[in-house]
Amino acid sequence: MASTFFGLDIAYTGVQAANAKLNTTANNIANVDTKGYTRQEATQVASDALRISQSYGMAGTGVTVTDINQVRNEFYDVKYWQAQTNLGQYDMKMYYMYQIEDYFTDKDTVEGFEPIFSAMFDSLEEVYKQAGTPSTKTQFIGAAGDLCEYFNAQATNLEKLQLGVNEEIKNKVDEINSIAEQIATLNKQINTIEVNHLRANELRDKRNLLIDQLSKIVDVEVRETPIYTTPGGTEKSGIYTYEVSIAGGQILVQGYEYNTLECVARSAEEKVNQSDADGLFEIKWSNTMDFNLYGANLGGELKGLIEVRDGNNEEYFHGTTKSVKPNSDGTYEVTIEVPNKDYLTDMNKCTLPDSGQLTLVNTKYKYSGFEFDGTKIPATYTFKIEREAGQADPTIFDGKEARVGTKVDYQGIPYYQEQMNEWVRIFAKAMNDIEKTAVDEEGKPAEVLFTAKEKVSGDEIKFTADLADNKYKSSDSDYYRLTAGNISVNNEMVKDASKFGTTVDIKKGGDAQDVTELLLTVQDDKNKVNFRGCSAKEFLQCITSDIALSANNAKTFTENYTNINKSVSQTRLSISGVDNDEEALHLVKFQEAYNLSAKVMQIMTEIYDRLILQTGV
């Protein structure tokens, strides 16, 4: 049988439910501008009915508020994270490609390639007109030095930019580690509360906001799995395992545990590309597991930074091991056949450092030099490698894949470094080959006009090696050792311009200019300098077209993903965000419900007053 005060109890549950909804609405309104806040709503259900001794059998007992839940759609969360990942990647590319474009753009305030190159050949034209005049030779040598300084400066700019990107990569790794730690801590706090079958909404908001931040840095996958009270059971314990994966499924956070990444600087012997800056970071898991830095599934700002720093347009050293021979000193000679691709068979395009790491399948061995043999197809490279303690015997990799570095399908800093190196090698060789046919004013054979300076010793490399047989050693004095960063004018000519020869025969007189005439043709003659089908003076057009294309692509994708991001974000906010107008309607609605339940209580009170006070019950 129902209590005498049954109706009053029912009205009280209505007041409680309306009050809970009013408080939830008030909380939503208070957090309308809180970043990451998810709109909440109180869930109410009818209370369990009560059996009574009446013909209708059971009577309702009012209402119960079961939960205060977040209004959230996981589908749009995933879409938002994907949009953030893509936006982060192209935003980084656009930012740095505009910087590279700025380096190569001729400005009114700073002379670029075209005016410097033109000035050099203008001064050479003056030598042609007045071959016996010392001042014209001095002016030409100075103009040639200006061209060298231009490339030196560009190489330095790209190296500094590469180091800047490298530092930004470290910052992003630190951010990932910090976010991982915070998520693991929040997982524990959330489970501590929710094991009592409560809902830690605010803590969940903090965690979701961290995932939002992480998704822009790197691609992210989230999985939340309930834990049941018994294995194979159906009753949930209230605890969940929250797992976060990045970079194509690599575990970052698993429940209360998290993994961290660390940046390990490459040593000078571990360079991947010849012109790479020293100390570029490899990223590894702190538990010694490899982090798949170049995986196709990597995304976000980290991917954009990696592609800018390491992008080689897929032009990297790779081939198949032909033979592995042990030496008496404990080293090994590994001969590798390479595909018939010009960036592997033309030493002007090759980017191998003198020493570095050769990867046989998945094992890295240090090499201290290499030899190239291009006399037959396929061309071969022979490396001298060292086997460290614990490493596999290299002979087991006979016939297996070999590589230095890895392919990165983007025209990043290494690509533009290689393009400059290739041009200065072709151009310097063309000029030097002509100049070496001349004699100076004393009748002595002229030396090369352009040289390379050793980075450490500062010694000049004058390219004395003979590559007529298309063979090369990394220790040879050849144009492969010439880069945009070390090209210079022969110091002997800088000191004494008379060392610059203008004729093949001094007997022709001081005004003889047959060599000068040939040198002048280098700027236009594609038979002497052919850079990607262009003449020497068209170098900048080739480079800037690449940069402009990459920069415009990055800009277009950034704009597209910005629009997608905004669209998904708006849809997401329409579901989980707080709308002032909607909450204002809820206030009126729940106030009315509260008033009605209160009115019921008032009426029931009057009934009980009459029943108790006036009937003498």
Annotate each language-model stretch with its function.
Residues 1-617:
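Structural signature of extracellular appendage/secretion-system components
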